[in-house]
């Protein structure tokens, strides 16, 4: 600090000290920084993408004294706020209300034949999202972060430079946090594929579809199929194999498939769309079912109002002109980074879905903040630990999972060193209801001390109960630690501390 102005010493205001520290950290990077071109605006930190990860990193950097800017071409908040987690959770809550209405009579209430209005919930949902957009805008303004509206592409310059609407911007530290986009089949693969929509289009629907076909077996497909079915749409879920969520623990994969079918979703197994045609009564799908050991059969699904592709997500990196600065990607376009979120180009970083690892909003936020602390607070070891990240699927009933699946644990520790505890029961909520859902739980333990390395569950309340158990797994709790915890009765969560 001796080389800094006297005003930035011990007695300086916190904001000035933070700015000085940020400047010191930025200057501490190895290599000789090149001055920007005369027609280029310069910042300490330039973030491409105004989604959860980018905004979290920019705001944390600003708190630490960096002069930051965010480039965003659309609405602030990214996928999560606009076409993901937030509006999805509103629709899931709506679907849960619909399910509970079926149980009112069993709980002693007079028959409730409430008529559902898609228009009402859509209007309220969209208004809520709009309020969040405004909050994000205000937060950036309060943090003195400049917002640059437009599409960013890397351009020529003495150091990594970004061009937006004909203007150039640069910084010693540039973060790419552009997220991902839904995958859509190419017309050459499936003629008429463009007649379908994606999860983005789901939030643009003006009416509840009468007949829906969801294609995909991942969590997005499962969630949307469950929502539409619960709200009254005749729904089919088309999957290539015989189970959904095949990357999850086998217990969850099997049980979720069963619960979907019990809830009235038609699960079309070993089935794929071959062609889509538009008719006077909607869409007509030609599908092929190829059950192993049997001859493939072709059938038609007529009068489809909503065909929704939920077959994965692609990195939103195509328009960035990454080759201009030589940033390396994989074959799908995911930006390659190391454990500290560094790309192969000095001073350029990436977080979130564009990297293709753990596509979850809290992961992008945590990684972005850790990066800001490393760059502007001199915390050189600041990085996100990607192990034991908890996740929830808002299915019906919801799924909670953290840590290793049984198969992953066996692969890591050996079959003889893994012990499984599991249970299945009917939640007390259903003690008096005609409608039933199960709750299933599995605890994966490793080695002699029976360290808990994985917890997987599906049932009412599993979404909310997971967070606390995830802390225990992250801290290295053992089965004995769970056993020594007094149960809360009567709850579903007590099952995890009474497993035998």
Curated annotation (Swiss-Prot):
So what EC number does this one have?
Answer: 1.8.1.7
Q: Which domain of life is it from?
A: Eukaryota
- Positions annotated to bind NADP(+): 217, 220, 223, 240, 246, 312, 359, 392
User: Where is the transit peptide, renumbered to this chain?
Assistant: 1-26
Q: Which GO terms describe its molecular function?
A: flavin adenine dinucleotide binding; glutathione-disulfide reductase (NADPH) activity; NADP binding
Q: Which residues bind FAD?
A: 52-53, 72, 79-80, 88, 152, 353, 361, 489
Q: Where does glutathione bind?
A: 52, 59, 136, 369
Cysteine disulfide partners in this protein: 80-85
GO cellular component term, pick one: external side of plasma membrane
Known catalysed reaction(s)?
2 glutathione + NADP(+) = glutathione disulfide + NADPH + H(+)
GO term, biological process aspect, one: glutathione metabolic process
Required cofactor names: FAD
Q: For this protein, what does the record note about how its cofactor is bound?
A: Binds 1 FAD per subunit.
Residues with N6-acetyllysine modification: 75
The positions flagged as active site in the entry are: 489
Keywords per UniProt: Acetylation, Cytoplasm, Disulfide bond, FAD, Flavoprotein, Mitochondrion, NADP, Oxidoreductase, Redox-active center, Transit peptide
Its biological purpose is as follows: Catalyzes the reduction of glutathione disulfide (GSSG) to reduced glutathione (GSH). Constitutes the major mechanism to maintain a high GSH:GSSG ratio in the cytosol.
Q: Which PANTHER family match?
A: GLUTATHIONE REDUCTASE, GLUTATHIONE REDUCTASE, MITOCHONDRIAL
So what family is this one in?
Belongs to the class-I pyridine nucleotide-disulfide oxidoreductase family.
Instruction: State the oligomer form and interacting partners.
Output: Homodimer; disulfide-linked.
Task: Report further notes.
Answer: The active site is a redox-active disulfide bond.
What's said on domains? Answer: Each subunit can be divided into 4 domains that are consecutive along the polypeptide chain. Domains 1 and 2 bind FAD and NADPH, respectively. Domain 4 forms the interface.
Q: What is the protein named?
A: Glutathione reductase, mitochondrial
The protein's organism comes out as: Mus musculus
Name the gene. Gsr
